[in-house]
Amino acid sequence: MSSTVEFDPQSRPTEADAYAQTSLPEVLPELVKQSLPKHVAIIMDGNGRWAQTQGKPRVMGHKAGVKAVRRAVSAASQLGIQSLTLFAFSSENWRRPDKEVSLLMELFFTVLQREIKLLDKNQVKLNIIGDISRFSARLQKQIRAAEEKTAGNSGLILNVAANYGGRWDILQAAQKLAEKVETGEMTSSQFTEEALSEHLCMQNQSEVDLIIRTGGDYRISNFVLWQAAYAELVFLDTLWPDFDEQAFHEAIATFANRQRRFGLTGSQIDEMRAL
């Protein structure tokens, strides 16, 4: 049986999907808009369970999840968030049944083909993070083409984590630095936190401010471990295909109402704000 993934016509992007066409939500107070995170990361969990509740195959949940991705990108773009990172396929997901993995790879290829024009139109810069060497040559070629097409865009940076793991990211950065030390390009004393950060997948972006996880679980699943050292965490029971702009805005409002201390006391933060 063919593993080709077909989209229903309603799932395809249209002119009405242009992100700039929807105004900012009135539900967000001005204070929240002033406290927006620069970098939001989302663990998109619950596709399979959503499909099961609908009496459908798991792949239908992944297909429905594509629409939620579009809504999240739209909401982030409208709010002026700098970076949005989506956990699409972890390095541990290869352990899933071969048929599901094959369908996910085909879905990834199809989505890259069909969404890239909409992303480019809305000035979204696509960045695939992770070890893509394990993907087929066909998929790797499509990834490079999509990244190249949007490379010059100045809007939202959309990082899609594919065959990604937080530990892998730290390890590959450390290995690059170790090689530089070995070849004499740098000394061991220059092996610093800053140097390591510069060799991670998202080296030119701000650290993650907010992690949103859908699906009702309370863990970060080896996702952006280094970059999320001081991130606020918001866990939602909502299954990913049901995630919409309202859920995104509510998570942003939750973030804005928290006091981020970075090791300081609450009193110190209040004093700094009063200056």
Curated annotation (Swiss-Prot):
Reactions performed catalytically: 8 isopentenyl diphosphate + (2E,6E)-farnesyl diphosphate = di-trans,octa-cis-undecaprenyl diphosphate + 8 diphosphate
Keywords noted in UniProt: Cell shape, Cell wall biogenesis/degradation, Magnesium, Metal-binding, Peptidoglycan synthesis, Transferase
Gene Ontology annotations for the cellular component aspect, listed alphabetically: cytosol
GO molecular function, one term: ditrans,polycis-undecaprenyl-diphosphate synthase [(2E,6E)-farnesyl-diphosphate specific] activity
Active site: D45, N93 (proton acceptor)
Residues noted as binding Mg(2+) in the record, renumbered to the chain: D45, E232
Cross-referenced PROSITE patterns: UPP_SYNTHASE
Reported cofactor(s): Mg(2+)
Listed PANTHER family: DEHYDRODOLICHYL DIPHOSPHATE SYNTHASE 2, DEHYDRODOLICHYL DIPHOSPHATE SYNTHASE FAMILY MEMBER
UniProt protein name: Ditrans,polycis-undecaprenyl-diphosphate synthase ((2E,6E)-farnesyl-diphosphate specific)
